[in-house]
Amino acid sequence: MSHNDTIVAQATPPGRGGVGILRISGLKARDVAQEVLGKLPKPRYADYLPFKDVDGSALDQGIALWFPGPNSFTGEDVLELQGHGGPVILDLLLKRILTLPGVRIARPGEFSERAFLNDKLDLAQAEAIADLIDASSEQAARSALNSLQGAFSARVNHLVEALTHLRIYVEAAIDFPDEEIDFLSDGKIEAQLNGVIADLDAVRTEARQGSLLREGMKVVIAGRPNAGKSSLLNALAGREAAIVTDIAGTTRDVLREHIHIDGMPLHIIDTAGLRDANDEVERIGIERAWQEIEQADRVLFMVDGTTTDAVDPADIWPDFIARLPKNLPITVVRNKADITGETLGISEVNGHSLVRLSARTGEGVDVLRNNLKQSMGFETNMEGGFLARRRHLQALAEAANHLEQGKAQLLGAWAGELLAEELRLAQQSLSEITGEFTSDDLLGRIFSSFCIGK
């Protein structure tokens, strides 16, 4: 579809509401105003007017806002009609607007896409609009707003600018070898490169925090039947999300709860008790449990403290540990401390966290909450933080890899040309975040996930 078309869409959620908003953007927005309102409202002033049908009768009445381009969200002429939020009224008004030539329904995210294409937003800011709408916590919303206001983009642009200056110095020295500049050995380039690498590492750390806020962490509770997995799910969720009985195999399917710990979203998954089951339904539940374990960010290995004194996971259940994906983090949870009399708290055993608690009474659960937060490197106080997506983390990682490769070329092979190429590739990876070097296919995938009226 052409970006020269005029587009229209409902900007408020579907259904009944006090106010319903239609947004129009493009060259024909002026014609829509003349036809529907009978006049062109004063720019950026609210005008209370009837919204007219083809025959001149009123369909509704409400507020009209006129934003002539380029001083608008999309950079084009934009008209907003704010009427009553009844679906029938909005549908009649939308059909009236679509009778005008050159006007069509907007695709999902097309308003934000046009803002990006018209340099009103960079790509990271455009993505932040969707993240702000989808934010599941106050901290996620604040970080998304920071991204929308350019906090993330500013950090990326600072890195790109630093790389630009470094490339200029390196490539000038390559192009003018007769000048008395021994750029490979004077230490200046290495110092500047180390500075950029350090700055990039800091941005990556903040981006991982932002990704946690946006994506959350998937935590799977796994263990033998009757270890207290469902009781722990209920304790973490703060409600009776799962049925708890003394009958082994009560949980036969996957149960999911979405919770927050100091603003960090967690996807907690309770699974069927792992054992050799004869029941077909229970076997299916166990298969699903292993599927969830293989996709987890962390496993809470639930142990009934009344059945064993062992604390090393390899001693508790070696077959279970052997089947876990390599490098999957584990927190061993020794449950039923209210019965065993074990001291509540946390310790380290062979590189694994060990938490002693009682899921039934809730004692020690706060220790586990803090362990989950710290295990992901999450910090509660993130003033000025920003949200990040997986593609951002990937681009930052690629840039870091190119800088390390460039440093190796500088110090190991004294290869200035190869260093310059690695710097260029690092710069390109960073520019993909803000959209300076981004394929049309990626843009389509990003904006198609937006709301229709955004």
Curated annotation (Swiss-Prot):
GO terms for cellular component: cytosol. SUPFAM superfamilies: P-loop containing nucleoside triphosphate hydrolases (SSF52540), TrmE connector domain (SSF116878). Its EC number is 3.6.-.-. It is an enzyme of class 3 (hydrolase). GO terms for biological process: tRNA methylation; tRNA wobble uridine modification. (6S)-5-formyl-5,6,7,8-tetrahydrofolate binds at residues 23, 80, 120, 454. Exhibits a very high intrinsic GTPase hydrolysis rate. Involved in the addition of a carboxymethylaminomethyl (cmnm) group at the wobble position (U34) of certain tRNAs, forming tRNA-cmnm(5)s(2)U34. This is tRNA modification GTPase MnmE.
